């Protein structure tokens, strides 16, 4: 018999978010949809038309302040300790052009969860080799942001 707490993988974090925070995920999706209602078409190339309004919508809906609790529950589901209680600000909760990134330092790594609400077409020549530093592709296509259907959850422990 051992006193060690069993640990689970990131799939348990995803399960807890889906099962226990379904309403929060719905609100995140509604906020993303509200952002796209201000666009002229189904996509935009200006990150400023995605991230700041998405953050304002999340804050105004109360979702932003509820995300740290969801992150804490996701960490608990992995069976790992969290270094500090999360707050609704970086580095724990970050609103990006793809959605919301939740991060928590664990005893043996970091849990990173993406609540993806947008896809980002990074433009360029499509060969997938770009590292995003500009390189020699001075006139590459701008990033294009599109709303995806629903909110996808991706999680990993790194």
Write out the residue ranges for each language-model feature.
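Acidic, polar-rich N-terminal leader regions of halophilic archaeal proteins
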Residues: 1-158
